[in-house]
Swiss-Prot record:
On the 2D-gel the determined pI of this unknown protein is: 6.2, its MW is: 25 kDa. This is Unknown protein from 2D-PAGE of needles.
Length: 53
């Protein structure tokens, strides 16, 4: 099974010492994402702890 990588990451500053990473998709990538099996679909937004923020 090949890993499917689509889109690009945009970093968005958040409050409460967090940074938000948003996966930005082009229209073609959105179609590819929608056609992935459910267990292979990506999480589009992830909040992580960022010690320098």
């Amino acid at each position: 099974v090949e890993n499917i990588v689509i889109g690009h990451m945009e970093v968005v500053a958040c409050a409460d010492s967090r940074v938000s990473f948003n996966l930005v998709l082009t229209p073609a990538e959105t179609v590819a994402y929608g056609n992935l099996p459910f267990d292979q679909q990506l999480v589009l937004c992830e909040i992580i702890t960022h010690p320098n923020f």
